[in-house]
Amino acid sequence: MNNNQDYLVQMFEKQKEFQKLLTGLDLPKKDYTQLNYTITALIAELGEVLQADKNWKNWKRTKDIHIDREALLDEVVDVYHFIINMTLYLGFDAKDVINKFFEKNKINFERQNNNY
């Protein structure tokens, strides 16, 4: 495992610790109510990413719109928290995600190279 993969493993571990602090429970657990709440929160956070980036509305584009990159990054990181929670609720860990990412990435490149 390289350093970047180690970081993802650490992110998953930190999120597990945080969820235990919030709920008193270890993840993963098969709680589809919590999974649904997590997916709803993820969708809301994605909306907050859009609101933090004022340039997404091409019909309202004006010159020199300032984007608060720190606020935008905060929202993106919140999205990661909920994606990690969702992944944990589904019973996967960081290594599962890493392995599947590279497997799927290879397939995606093959598809594009073969006019998919």
List the model feature ranges, each with a label.
Residues 1-116:
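Flexible "arm" and connector segments at domain edges
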